[in-house]
A protein has these predicted regions:
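Histidine-anchored nucleotide/phosphate-binding helix
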Residues: 1-3, 19-26, 225
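N-terminal beta-strand-loop-alpha-helix module at the start
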Residues: 1-14
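Flexible loop/turn segments at secondary-structure boundaries
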Residues: 17-19, 44-46, 71, 218-219, ...
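A residue-level signal for conserved active-site and pocket-lining positions in enzyme catalytic cores
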Residues: 36, 214, 246
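Beta-rich, aromatic/charged-enriched effector core domains that present basic-aromatic interfaces
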Residues: 22-166
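An acidic- and aromatic-residue-enriched active-site/binding cleft used to recognize and process polar
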Residues: 14-17, 41-43, 66, 251, ...
Length: 265
């Protein structure tokens, strides 16, 4: 993708010495570079190592906010103050909804009258009900290449290569997201907490892996899901329940990690 955008790319294999970030920074310095730019990896130890090595080599470091989260570190500082001893998820969730005007009516109140519809997310899955079918992406060049690479370079590692169930391209990821919106979103809220023996998906989105690796951004997922909800009369317990997983939990846990991660280790 980057090459298609005329970006010069140097690919570092996992078995190369430069796959160690400290060794890579040694190489960067030896080639005369005095400035590097990175996205925040949201990794306490990795950030420390990068900063320490850059200081050692007098390399200027410019850290950009990660597009994989809605909040910047500066945004999080308002809620996750060092002086606080306790952080409550519900308080954070409400503040995010208000600040971003997400599912808020013209009077500044939560749509539907409640901040959370968690109590409506606990229905049992109907006996005999067949869950919506998920269209697993077909095996493609990227999956085949990755499997061959893994077999060749990690022969002694545990596990085995089998059916790969996730999208690996932007187009596949968008199609996967659309499939959730069109076929599972409507009843997501009712069966969010349901468990059925021998079923692994039910009405869930399975979007976390795609957001975690950057194939979908949380901002895009939030905006598109809310827009779809309005146009298709998705129940409020489904819309709010889905939004809560991203801005109420994913962002909250990132904030906890950023503020207290080293302490919690």
């Amino acid at each position: 993708y980057l090459k298609s955008q005329d970006v010069k790319v140097s690919y570092i294999n996992s078995y190369d010495n430069e796959s160690n970030i400290l060794t890579l920074l040694d190489t960067v310095k030896s080639k005369g570079f005095n400035l590097i730019e990175i996205y925040d990896p949201v990794d306490y130890l990795l950030n420390r190592r990068i900063k320490r090595k850059c200081n050692e080599h007098n390399i200027d470091l410019l850290v950009h906010d990660s597009p994989q989260f809605l909040n910047s570190n500066e945004d999080l500082e308002d809620f996750f103050k060092e002086s606080k001893k306790k952080f409550f998820q519900t308080s954070f969730y409400k503040s995010e909804r208000k600040r971003r005007s997400i599912l808020i009516d013209s009077d500044g109140r939560p749509e539907g009258g409640e901040w959370t519809y968690d109590i409506l997310n606990r229905k049992k899955y109907p006996k005999g009900e067949i869950p919506p079918k998920i269209d697993i992406p077909k095996e493609n060049k990227y999956i085949k290449d990755s499997q061959s690479y893994t077999d060749e370079n990690f022969k002694e590692n545990y596990g085995k290569m089998g059916l790969f169930n996730y999208p690996v391209t932007f187009d596949e990821s968008e199609k996967w997201f659309n499939d959730f919106l069109e076929n599972r979103f409507m009843m997501f809220g009712d069966y969010e907490d349901a468990i059925v023996k021998e079923e692994i998906t039910l009405n869930h989105s399975i979007l976390s892996p795609l957001m975690n690796v950057g194939l979908l951004s949380p901002r895009h997922v939030i905006n598109k899901s809310i827009d779809f909800s309005k146009k298709n009369n998705i129940p409020i317990n489904s819309t709010e329940g889905f939004v809560r997983q991203i801005i109420g939990w994913r962002e909250f846990i990132r904030g906890i990690y950023t503020a207290k991660g080293s302490y919690e280790r």
